[in-house]
Amino acid sequence: MNTTTVSLERPNVHERRRENVATDINVNALVKNASKAIAPLWPIATFVARHPWMGLEHFSFEQVVHRLKLLRDIDLYPSMAMFRAAQRKGELNPKFLEMRLQRWLDEQPLTMPREEAERFCRAALLHEEIPNELLTSSSLKSLAAKMKDMRLRYDSNHLLTRPLSLLLEEQGKEKWARVLDHQMIKWCKLFLDESQALWAMPYREKGFYYAWRKLVINDPSLNKQQRERLKDLPHDPEEALRQALMLLGIPHGEMKGYLEAHLLSLPGWAGMLLWRSQQSGQAHLLLVDYLAIRLSLEWALIAPHLPFAKQKDDDEAFLLPLLAAWMHWGGWTPEKWLQLPQAEQQARLSFAYRFDKIVRGKLWLEAWEDTQEAQLKKRIASHSQNNEPKQAVAQLIFCMDVRSEPFRRHLEQAGPFETYGCAGFFGLPIKTRELDSSHAHASCPVIVEPRHEVQEFTSAENVKKYRGRRNALLSVSHTFKKMKQHLFASLLLPEVSGPLLGLHTLARSIAPSGAGRVFHQFQDNWAQKPATELSLNRESSLETTETTDLPVGFSTEEKVRYVYQLFKGMGLTSRFAPLVVVCGHESTTTNNPYASSLDCGACGGAAGGFNARVFAALCNLKEVREGLAKEGIVIPEDTVFVAAEHMTTVDDLCWLYVPTLSEAAQKAFDMLQGKLEEVSRNANNERLSKLPGLEGKKKDPLAEAHRRAEDWSEIRPEWGLAGNAALIIGRRELTKHCNLEGRVFLHSYDWRKDPSGEALANIITGPVTVAQWINLQYYASTVAPHYYGSGNKTTQTVTAGIGVMQGNASDLLAGLPWQSVMASDEEIFHSPLRLLVIIEAPQQNIERLFEDDPHFRRKVKNGWLRLVSIDPDSGEWKAWR
């Protein structure tokens, strides 16, 4: 007879996990894959809109919503308060909610009457949430206890991919997750500091992990035992990370998820390190350091609690909300429920589990988006025109930015002017170096690699004079900053600077507009830049000692190609007006860390005027016009290109480059100049009426706009791109007579002039991607402001010269402040909708686009943006899913 020995001893989970860990873990591959859970974060001085989930687009939007809810308890769908407010304002039609519900029910394997399922779902969608009194009632707990033998399949494996420090905290142990975050914030601030701190982090030049390893053993915020555990860490960060994973007992199959969870704990600091690594050409080097430090610290903190024993799943706690749902929304009582056969009980509980808060949020959001699409369709269909436009006196090329739409509309209403829209870098992949600057700025979208550098230059004598005046101003600022940071000099600073700064504060507070004018006049008079030229020609010989890794200027072929591509992409290939104005855009604000977020996203968070000036100058070159003529684009001899900047905070045009004008161009310029004050007044009047506190008030729009731009206490000088909801790619005739309320990106495009589809493909890969990033950043900052936003402007701290925090111990805040998306504490201004892309082109052109660009097709299929095409002949709208 065979005897079987059964061990009654509980296996050591920690030892079992360590045995499962391979010693040859590919740390770099793990970190690379895990880093997709976060997005790179640019310094705030060059604020770039970031799509927080750009690395997760291979998942559907709904899958990412589920994942982040499980990992970080973040709700990525708008709240019920937002949905109900949208319904009250007429932005959300209930009929679309019912349609979405019926579509969802059609996809479900129902094992209960359809009518009952519909009643339950409608009640769950439209009625109040389950009251806490019901969830904690003795009758419900008694009912759940009677059903303890019922087994429902549900996924609780997400617990395995959450940080052990967080799980211990949730079990009532010490606040280990908070302590760990506080430690990482401290070390990241020290390492990433951009000369804001007077004393730099020792050993910083040798790397993050090296410096931390040298310093942490003397960290007084850790106890003696914790410091002892960190004394003998490996010298190599990869080996340290590998060791930490083993000591924590993380199974090989869960390592990627575990690293993701730690990156998502502080996505701002981790995102800044990711950006730094990418800038150095070593895409994930600093994240390896970061995770090696973080997991080593986690092990040092929680070692006494290892091996970690996962708590048993509580079936009763799982059943309670499902039973409460049927009591509250289904109208059942405990007595009637117990009379149901077990199979029917299980069917209803399974259905309630599937129709969870995330599914309800999905249906509400899609109904809101359907309503917006239907309203936009009605507006466009009733105003679009197919007839050819009349010959314009002047044509103006604007950035496709939503803030350009009202200005363009009022401009076209004011006279015989025609406007076009494109990405505000005007197709120029350049770095720009202003006069006497040691730094060149990438003035193109972050997804575009600069290929050229364009520099401002003038005579050596002019540079010398300008440098002297400029250095005098900078030295005052530099001295003030150094005194402020110095331990002893800071004690003298109030005595030295008090009277002058007191007067400045008083003037800025009482009369911001007047004080601003005086300040700008002084700056212009003292440090006025001399007339400069641009290094457009590759063979330009510049009197400069600056070095660059890019070619300076363009060859003739490159000049022609860039100009041709932009004209072709916009459909502007003939009928040129005597005057063509290339308009960049810039925002003017005071005391605003987020100033760059109001500038041009297509120019890397800088003003677009430099690019406008370069493009206009290229268009006036004889060799460019000759090259364009060979490609079939003939520009009349009397057509002159000029450059301007649209100041979005005050809705005005500032002239940057006006060469000698032909007679026809001069007449057009004078006519345009004569209309600008009227256009500015009307555009400001429309824009200011949407700002909180100004609704319905009688104010001089020009004066009020300038006051807000100069007032350093103004938390909302303009709305920026709040409200953005759609991007229209098509002829201006489609939308010229529509009031799109500053909510739509407008990119000019004529499918008839793009037989190959190349121009449309370029618009999709560039401008559409930038617009999507902007849209999803506003979305994230609205629906999850505590995680993806940056809180209240008035309580923010600029830290380490790179970003903002709330207080001195928060994550590096990556998103927008609530003043950028909220009208008040209770009311949102920005409607969190995924971008609706509308393309005016035949259906076969869209099909070809999908074939050629599977990445874009995936965005549409996975719900990261919405796509509609308009047939140019029939006007029929087709939604692509």
UniProtKB/Swiss-Prot annotation:
Location within or outside the cell: Cell membrane
Keywords: Cell membrane, Membrane, Metal-binding, Transport, Zinc
GO MF annotation terms: zinc ion binding
Primary location class: membrane
GO cellular component, one term: plasma membrane
Record: residues binding Zn(2+): C399, D401, H585, C600
Family: Belongs to the inorganic carbon transporter (TC 9.A.2) DabA family.
Subunit structure: Forms a complex with DabB.
Protein name: Probable inorganic carbon transporter subunit DabA
Annotated organism of origin: Geobacillus sp. (strain WCH70)
